[in-house]
Each structure stands twice: as structure tokens, then as C-alpha cells.
Amino acid sequence: MFEKIKQGVRNMLRSFLQIQEAQPTSFTVHELMDYEGNAFKNNIWYRGDSYELDQLYKQIPNTNCSFWGSVPTPGMEIIKKHTGLPKIIVNTLSSIVLSDLNNIEFENVEKNDLWERIVKENKFYKQLEKATKKALVVGDGAFKISFDPQISQLPIIEFYSGENIDINYDRGRIKEIVFHVQYTVNRAVYVLHETYGFGYVMYKLYKGNSEMPLNSIPQTTNLVDITFDKSFCMAVPYIIFESDKWEGRGQSIFDGKIDSFDSLDEAWSQWVDALRAGRAKTYVPECLLPRDCITGKVLKPNYFDNRYIKTDSPLSENANYKIDTEQPVIPTENYIQTYITALDLCLQGLISPSTLGIDDRKITENATAQREREKTTLYTRNAIIESISEMLPRLVDVTFKAYNTWLSKPIEDTEIEVSFGEYANPSFEAVVETLSNPNTPMSIEAKVEEMWGDTKDDEWKANEVRLIKEQTGVVTLDEPKVNLEGALNE
């Protein structure tokens, strides 16, 4: 009987606790901008002109709550100032990477001379610097190799920013890169699509959405489609960070940081506005105003060195004629803390304040914390180096193959190794200081290995160990030989 009651209770609970599955829910989220629009916005931030930023945000919808998109109440306008931090970040990152790039050399003397001529004529390292900045700002780009006997007898290397190219993929592999070149003829805009694929280059001219003959404008009259060996493509993409938003495209370092840059500009603009509003004001009774010694007229105030506000002279019997100066109190510490917080959010995950020359004593309390923050610069630098180390050998190889194809010579693979010098960061200096201590419980070989790791080859490290031992007076003696054969004969 008792078991039947228990079973009945269980059945009642089961029916009571039935859980219905949730109905499928669909969400629709609209992107604010496409890739080209986002690239344009990032370019304006990089240019760093407050007038251009103000115009840009007046045209972007749903940005009324942002600092640059807001419109002040009439009579309460504030001067919007831009710190220029985005441009400083990009230029600094590009500089600390490319300044350590070692020269590319080949074992073949003829190739070495040819590459030096190509580098000199194309100003290649300047182009690489510009390309790196554009890839950081826009997200990606591509190098294009072409030939024009009227300009040069060598390959012409050009870089196109990400907003001027399309990258087409086939099963996760790059199929072709389309370069967009704009021409304006008789106030009409034409766009040339140069499609660079494996073994071919094709040209199409568009006016709006309509395809036009190539002879429609003089700039494209002599262009013809070409085919060559299908083993290579005369275009090489340059992507530093992969985009999570646009599949197959690069990601700008500004993506996800625009709101932080906007807040930093707001903090700085408010601070400057408070300083301007907090100027000392001098109130002078009319009877004490400075006058011309000849005419007796009141001298007109000078905005540079003689500013004052005129007040009526007191008429009471015991009036005290005096000049009053008032200085409003500006909460400087509050503005500093706001500015530091906004600055920290802007640099987070990108670069260390000390790399930019910013005094971060108010951000970091000790040297150890500063060295840890400096590692952020190393992570970003290593990501840029990795992308250059992947792109540059491909570009050099394709350049030589394209040149041989143009000369109707057989093509061959060209392999190079891209190397960079060491970045003198506080972390490395701390390692040197620690390992140079003679009381460190490590052998010389272990210290050299810990200090240089994979950045130096085994031969270099063995030679370094030998030099250190010689300098410290450590002598390595050969193992004494024992003439066992003579001893056995005796």
C-alpha cells in the first residue's frame, strides 16, 4: 500500500515538472558600416584632424550620444579637441618594427644586385613602411606587381590599401585579388578592376554599374588581358590581424577602440574648457580704471596683458575702492584621473605608455609593473613581425618570377629568410641585469641560452660562451692523454 502511494506521488510530480522546450528565436542585427565605410572612418581617425572628425560624425547615424557626434546646446558650445593618439600609436608600432628589419641578401650575386636595383627604384622600404601603417589602420592591403616599359625596365611594385581591393577565396584559399583604380575624365568617374589571379591578369572598366570598353578613356586603352604560369599570382596580400567581423579580411587596431578614443578626446576637451573658464577675472571700479594721461579717457583693455571687468563705483559714504581678482578652483586631480583611465583603455592590448614616451608613474607604481606593461608592446610587435616574415618572402619570390616571365625566361623558386634585430625593452634589460650577476646559480652556457633563446643560432651562442669565459678568466684545458699502450708493453 505504501509503495503504491509513493508511486502515485512520483507520477504526479513527473507530470507537474514537465519542461517545454524553448521556441526558436531569430535576431536581426544591422551593421553600421561595411568594410569600406569602416576603413574610411579609421583613416579619418588616423589623419587626426578635429575638423574632419566633426564632419564625419555629423554624417554617421545613431552617434548623437558620442562626444564627436553630439551637438552642444546653443550658447554652451565647447571646443572639441583631438589628442592625436591613434596616429602616434600606428607610427610608433611601425617604427619599432621596421627599424630593426635586416637587409635581404641572396647567395646569388646577380639576384642580389637585381633586388637592390628593384628596391632602390621602387623605394621599397618606404612603401613597406606605408603599407604597414595602412594595414594597421585599415586592416589589410595588397602588393601588386606590374610592368611598364615607358616607366621602368624593372618590376613595378605598388601597394593598395584595403578599401581599394577585394580578396576572393575558394575553399579558404585566396583565388584572386581585385584592385580598384579610379579615374576621372571629363567629370565622369571610371573605376578599373584589375583582377590578379594565379596565371592571369584581367581588366574591366566600369562607369557606375555599367561595364565600358577599355578604350573609353586614354589611361586604359593599351591594357590587354594576359596569362602566364599558373603556379603563382602577381599580387600578395598583407594582413596583420584577422578580422572577426569580415571573413577573410584584416582587422584594424582601431576596431573596438573608437569609443575609447572618443572618451579620451572628451576628457581632454573638458579639461581644456575648464582651464579656459577658470581664468582669473579682475573686477575694477570705474573710478580706478587706467586712463590716458593726456585725454583722460579710459584705456581700452588689452586681451594679452591687461584684461579686466569694469564695475560701478560704490556711492556709500564709507565705500572701499579696491580691485578684486577671483580665481575659480579647478578640480585638476579629478580631470587627471579621468584622463589616465581613458588613456589606459585606449592603449590596453596595443602598446605600453612608456613606448610612446608617456610618463606612466601615475599608472604603474613600480618598475616590475612597468616591465609587465611593456610586454604588451612586444606582443603587438611580434604579431607585425610574424605577418611581415610571411608576406615578404612571398613578395620577393613572386617579383623574381614575374620578372623572368616578362623576359620569357624559365621561372624558379627564390627562398629568403627575413630577420629582425632585438627590441631593447625593459624586460630584456632586467634579464641582462639578473643574469650578469656572478652569484646567479647558473652556468655560463645556461645564461646565454636563457638570454638569447632562439634569436641566435647555436654557433653564435657557442662563440659568445667562449668570449665570456675568456673575459672572466675561465680557461678550458684539453683532457690529458694517457699512453695506455706503452703502459701495457711495460
Describe the function of each predicted region.
Residues 1, 5, 11, 266-272, ...:
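Glycine- and charge-rich intrinsically disordered segments
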Residues 130-132, 147, 276-284, 356-362, ...:
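Short coil/turn segments at secondary-structure boundaries
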Residues 110-114, 120-128, 135, 256, ...:
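Short amphipathic alpha-helical segments
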Residues 107-108, 292-293, 312-430, 466-474:
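Surface-exposed loop-to-helix/strand elements on domain peripheries
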Residues 224-369:
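Extended, charged amphipathic alpha-helical segments
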Residues 261, 437-490:
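Activation/maturation switch segments at domain boundaries
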Residues 130-132, 136-138, 142-251:
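Extended, regular secondary-structure scaffolds
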Residues 1-159, 164-168, 172, 488-490:
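Extended, helix-rich architectural segments
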